[in-house]
Every structure is written in C-alpha cells, then in structure tokens.
Amino acid sequence: MSNQPVSLNHPAAAPKNERRLRGVALISVLTALMLTLLLEALDQTVVGTALPKIIGALQGFQDYTWVVTAYTLGSITMIPIISKLSDQFGRKWFLITGTTIFLVGSALSGAAQTIDQLIAFRALQGVGAGIGIALVFTVVGDIFTPAERAKWQAIFGVVYGFANLIGPTLGGWLTDHGPLISGLITDTTRWRWVFYINLPVGIIALAALLVYLPTNISVRSSTHVGWAAIRRIDFPGAFLIASATICLLLGLTWGSNQIYAWGSAQVIGILAGSAALYVLFFVRERFAAEPVLPLDLFRNQVFASAAILSLLQLMILVALIIYLPLFLQGVLGISATYSGALITPMTISSVIGASLAGVIIANTKRYHLITIVGSLVMTAGVFLLATMTPSTSLFTAAVYMVIAGLGLGVYFSVLNLAAQNAIPRSRLGVGTGSVRFLGQLGGVLGVAIVGTVVNNTLASDIVKRLPAGAAKQLTPTGLQYATNPQILVNSQYRATVVHTATDFAVKNAVAHVPPGPQHAQTIAAITAQVTQQVQHLLSQVFEALRLSLAVAIQHGLIAILIFCGITIIVTLFLKDIPMVQRYNAEHAEASAPSESKEDLPVKP
C-alpha cells in the first residue's frame, strides 16, 4: 500500500481555478455549512427520546423502530452516488437540493398524522440529509488547502459529534417543553417541534448557500459534457450499492431489534442477498467508466486507514450514545433530563479533544501521533466505563465519560483531513463521501452488534435473578412485559404494567369467591392482599431487571472496548503525509496531464 495520493490516470483533468472565498462570503458559507451539518446530524439521534410521545399520538407501536431506520436508510444510500456526481458536475446545486429536500421532509414529518406518513417523510428527510452529510466536509476541503483544513475540519467534526451527543437531550426537552401554539401545537403534540425546529435555521443556511457559495467551487474540467457526461454516470453501480446497503441495514435492524431471530430465514436471507449485491457491485466498479466508489482509492494506505477508522469511530460513538443513557436512567435511576445533563461533560470534553487536535495538527502539519494518543485515551475511558456497576457514583460515571469523550473528539478532527490529504483534489468528493458512508454504516453496525450482546446477556442473566414463582404468578406474557427495560426508564409504562398485572391477579383471585353476607368484605380483603403480594413481587422483578441490565450493558461496553482495541491497531497505519501549503500546482488548467503535480503533495 502506498502512502502517496493515488494517480488519476483519468480523462478528466484537474479542477479549474476556484474563486477563493474571503470576508463576508467565507463567513456566510462556513456558517451555513455548519448549520446544515448540525441539523442533519442532529436528526440522527434527536428523535429517539421523543418516540414514546410520538407513538402515543400517532399509534403504531409495532413500527416504533422504523421512524429511526427510515432516516438512516434514506441518508446512507445517497452518500456514494452524490459524492461521485459532485466530482463530475460540481457541489453547489446538489448541496442546495439536498438541503431543500431535508427541510421539506422536516416540515412534512412535523405535520404527519399517521405513523406510516411519518416513516415515509422521515425517509425523504434522510435522503436530503445524506446529500448534505456527503458534501459538507467535501466543500470545506474545496475551500481550504490541507494545511488550512486542520482547524476547520476540527470545528466541523466537533459540530457533527456535538449534534450526535446532544440530540437525545434536545429531543427530550422539545417534547416536554416546546412552545405551545393555539390550535396547532398542544401539550400532546409538542413532539412536532423536533422536526419544525429545523425550518427557520435551515432556511437561513439555504439562503446563505444560494447567495455566497460559488458554482465553480469544485467543478471539474472534462472532455465529457452534457449528455455525454450523464451517460458516463455509473447508475448500475449506484443501484447495486444502494440495494446492498438497504438489505444489510434491514437485516441488522431485524436481528438487533429482535423483530426476527438472527437465525431466521428472513434475516439470513436478506443478509445473504446483501452480500451477493455487494459482490456484484465490486465487480461492476472494476469496469465502470466513472465508478461510484473507485476501489483503487483503498490501495492508498492512509486513505484506507482513515476510512476504516471512520467506520470504527461511529461504531463506538453511536453505541455509547444509545447505551450510556440507558445505564444512567435504568441502572443508576436518574431522570432523562438529569441523564442528558450528566452526558454534557462528555460532549464538552469531545469538543476540547477535537479542538486540541486541530490546533496541534495546524501547527505541526502532522496527525499520526495525536491520533494514537486519542485512541489510547478513548480506550482508557471506555475501559473505565466497562467497570461501572449499580453502585457507581454519578460523579465517577461523569469522569469516565469525560475521558472517553476527550479521546473520541480527536477523531472528529483527523479522519476527513487525513483522507482528503491522501487523494487528488479531483477525487475529493468521492473520497470524502466514502469516508462518510463507512462512518454512517459503522453507526448501524455498532448498535446492531452491541444491541445483540446486551439483549442476549439480559435474557440469560434475568432468568437467574427472578424470584421463585414469578413466571407462574405473572404468566409468561406478564413476565415478558415486566422484564422489558422500558420499565426502568419510562414511569408511565411501569405504572401500566403494575396496574395490568395487579388487576389480572385480583380478578383471578376473586373469581371463585362464593356469594354470602361477607362477600364484599371478603373481596376487599382478598384484593388488598393480592395487590400487596403482586406489587411486592413486581418490585423484586424490577430490581432483578435493574441488576441484569447493569450486567448486560457492561458486556456491551466490553464489546465497544474491543472496537477500541481494533481502532488502536488501525491508527498505527494512519501515517503522516506532508500537507499542501498552497494550490499552485494543483490549480493547473485543464490541459495539465493527469499524472502531473496535481497528484503530489507540496512539502511544507
């Protein structure tokens, strides 16, 4: 594997000289890009805490997970093709189109009247978000030289990580405290603010992009124009990778959410179909004139390492986002609001980690050593998190999260920068998009793997802890509801289960009481006795569930720790490449040969 940027050997030559952005135009474009990324990344996690209220309003509990899955499917399938098309035809109008689609999807999601409508509109919203996520980091690479990119990629990485971390807290706050609007937003429909909040911010960003983002910021000079260029688009490759990814995500979602068993024909069949489609995609890419995902990029050691690290980073980050709040609320017994406040220091530490890494890289023009340090700090933090028990203090948990966040933050600064520095500018879109695609895929893989570990551990451990006779007294169905982790984090669900189980037991107990002069008193006495017995039994079941959940999440954190160990190994291959200080050679006109200095970094 080479550490130098791959040579193009391609009929398309280097990009035209871009108009450099300065002053108001530069500030406006950067602000718009940050707002776009913030909203589109935020919507990956902001809906989770609002889902109970949404399901309560729209019904359709059986489709609970699809509200999140639809967004992921829409976004991840768009990244590869849009990244490639932006290299061929420019970025501005793709970015504006994606932002518009995202805002339309947000408005429609907020106005949804049924769960099916919400799922469809979330998919539309995801399509727009996928376009934005694919292009925002790429446009930053267009604007700045690699030597300048370090601090800006750090800032944008912080925005992306901050959005993912703060999403659950913001979603919960909007659902509980969003403003009321007479006739439109009531106490039971405050959840609509989760989607409507995107509109004013997104419109400002859209206007700034329309006015200040140059159309020639990244357009490639090419001998192919018009329909000739369109005919070279790899539509079969785009269809194959989208289909393969959808099948993969569906299989992982079905298995990890226990919709179907991992060994079921449905899961095995769709995962096998995904594997077959990926094989066809890789074969197709070897012969495509303009491949959606040029496989030769992965022969570059630095680019391949950055892409794999993006996959691993999101596996770790998203799994922590999902399961740390569950531990804090379900095991340590704090509220959702307090849980969000406790995770805030982790968010701040990730910002500090990213900022420090950005400053160090900007000054040294090197990223290898700081990335190794970041991986070690992150691993130490996750190791400490994996030692938490039901008796762990909140302060201790917060300290452990701060350490993990500090290490994770380093990766927000490094990965896009390293990948972009390792490839020619004419491949900036498809290269950056590949890194983002693997990152999005990593988020799904991480949750699927850790979720399976947590669910399997919980199912086996709870059996050992249940009080004797619990299954007989509560019935299998009642026990299933009583051992659902939602019991520990949702007081309304817990009250419903207690009421239902008590009512069922009382009715069975009094069904055969013979009539007589003391009938009413007997019924009252039996009701009081059975109620006390059932509630005592349920309190024991809930405590057993709390202890089992602690063990299950601990095992899940050990799985995340394994991801961290792999990250350390891959980081060793992320070697330094001298960063370009200026674009003198890279701004050669279209007549420049494809193997010119455009492919070579300029040493600082």
Q: Where does each model-flagged region fall?
A:
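Transmembrane core module of solute transporters
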Residues: 24-79, 83, 117, 233-236, ...
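Alpha-helical transmembrane segments of multi-pass secondary-active solute transporters
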Residues: 64-65, 94, 152, 194-197, ...
